[in-house]
Regions:
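Sec-dependent signal peptide recognition
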Residues: 1-2
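Sec-type signal peptide cleavage vicinity
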Residues: 11-289
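C-terminal motif of bacterial Sec signal peptides marking the signal peptidase cleavage site
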Residues: 6-10
Length: 289
């Protein structure tokens, strides 16, 4: 079943002048695919994209169960749409947000916009509850729209459009921007896991280094951070942490150093490691595949 979040937009390649677009003409439909679970790779060894070809796709995102991951209510997808003319000149940029609610995606409510968008000077002039192709571009041959999407937990930007990315945030991307050219076309947003998941199952003292950075709206770019040490007290029920290691990577649990190994292609992206602090491994830990 397609998970369609309806935001308005339009596109045409018709040379004949057209009237102002109707709502039906201007809709951009987003197929929000589930994200692949950790440890899933394609045949070439790269992190697997979500979706595949099955019409009945399993959910694979954020409730981090041993079996699968699910999108959770409260999750937010930030979407940027760039509209170009036939000369490939950027003419208009819009930002929108889709929120998971009751097992479905919806636009932000008026109250959520008042609480979280209105105070954000950097975002509010680009923000649209529903994204529609600009009337001045509708019906012009050669126009197109590029779409970007990013998941950053359930966070909203601060007044400067910044969202902090720390080890408790699972960042999820689409692999490339999506281009749409035709009215009524469904934009299929397929996601992948760019980070590594470390699942600690019980209380312990955990230490590791990670890149902490800031995601910037509306530009959809990252502000360089620092490779910082993290000294964390894992709660009794355990916790998941997300980071981007490079080469061989070492963590410390209750003072014992543990080496994490990459997959056969030397990559940590999309890999998952589960460690029980009461049964620490005697050697390096390989990813779960």
């Amino acid at each position: 079943m397609l998970l369609l979040a309806l935001c308005a937009g339009s596109c045409t390649t018709n040379d004949v002048p057209t009237p102002d677009p109707t709502d039906a003409d201007s809709l951009i439909r987003f197929d929000i695919a589930p994200c692949p679970g950790f440890g899933e790779v394609d045949t070439d060894g790269s992190p697997a994209l979500s979706g595949g070809t099955s019409a009945d796709r399993p959910s694979t995102r954020i409730t981090q169960t041993p079996e699968a991951a699910q999108w959770e209510d409260g999750d937010i997808l930030w979407i940027r749409t760039d509209f170009y003319n036939a000369a490939k000149e950027l003419k208009t940029t819009y930002i929108t947000a889709l929120k998971r609610d009751g097992g479905h995606w919806r636009s932000l409510t008026d109250q959520e916009e008042e609480d979280h968008i209105a105070p954000c000077v950097a975002v509010r002039r680009f923000y649209k509850k529903e994204i529609r192709w600009p009337n001045e571009l509708y019906g012009i041959p050669g126009i197109y729209c590029q779409i970007y999407a990013r998941y950053l937990g359930q966070q909203y930007p601060d007044a400067d459009g910044k969202i902090a990315v720390t080890p408790d945030i699972d960042v999820i991307n689409i692999s490339n921007y999506y281009s749409t050219f035709y009215p009524g076309e469904v934009a299929e947003l397929r996601f992948y896991q760019p980070l590594t998941r470390l699942r600690i199952t019980k209380a312990c003292q955990l230490q590791f280094k990670s890149w902490n950075y800031t995601f910037l709206l509306p530009g959809f770019n990252e502000e360089s951070g620092a490779y910082v040490p993290n000294d964390l007290q894992v709660p009794p029920g355990g916790e998941d942490y997300f980071f981007n290691p490079e080469y061989n990577y070492t963590i410390s649990i209750n003072g014992q150093k543990i080496q994490l190994l990459p997959d056969a292609q030397g990559s940590f992206k999309g890999m998952s490691y589960t460690i029980d602090p009461e049964r620490l491994p005697s050697g390096p830990v390989v990813p779960e595949l």
